[in-house]
């Protein structure tokens, strides 16, 4: 990556299992797993447990919000239960799953939902965007929302993924119940 920024020539980039993770730390936390199962017309949360924290799934139906500071920069993504109400008009308490003992809150922030229904009953609900529209959307996010520190290739700043207190408690309860079985 620093080769590119220094003007080096690259003929191609490869993608593969051994190429996206280090052999000594083969963890990629963006794998799709079952998070809920429909039982009697309702969705029951499911969780996959692993010795590697990044591989433990986030159970149940959920909503995900991108949280913005006063300047419009994304400060974190917030996972909540699907029907959970989020109010940012006052300081909003959240849980950092990596440091759950800390008492933290978003203040003077706004949020927008990241998950949108695109298909229902086999029918597409939204118009397909052109390649140019998608490129413009991503460019706008990179230019205006995502911190430069998160975009650098070497030692990037981590984008935070936080949880609502209720969602975090549900996840911890499921993990506790698995440990006691």
Describe each PLM feature range.
Residues 2-181:
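Gly/Ser/Thr/Ala-enriched C-terminal appendages of enzymes
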């Amino acid at each position: 990556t620093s080769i590119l920024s220094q003007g080096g020539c690259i003929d191609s980039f490869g993608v593969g299992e051994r190429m996206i993770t280090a052999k000594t730390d083969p963890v990629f936390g963006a794998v799709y797993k079952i998070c809920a199962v429909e039982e009697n017309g309702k969705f029951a949360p499911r969780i996959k447990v692993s010795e590697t924290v990044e591989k433990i799934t986030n159970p149940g139906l959920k909503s995900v919000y991108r949280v913005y500071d006063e300047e419009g920069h994304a400060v974190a993504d917030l996972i909540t239960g699907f029907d959970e109400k989020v109010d940012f008009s006052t300081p909003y308490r959240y849980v950092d799953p990596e440091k759950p003992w800390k008492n933290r809150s978003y203040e003077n922030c706004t949020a927008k939902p990241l998950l949108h229904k695109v298909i229902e009953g086999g029918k597409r609900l939204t118009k397909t965007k052109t390649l140019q529209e998608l490129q413009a959307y991503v460019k706008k996010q990179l230019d205006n929302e995502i911190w430069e520190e998160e975009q650098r290739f070497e030692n990037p700043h981590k984008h935070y993924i936080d949880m609502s207190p209720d969602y975090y408690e549900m996840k911890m309860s499921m993990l506790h119940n698995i440990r006691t079985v």
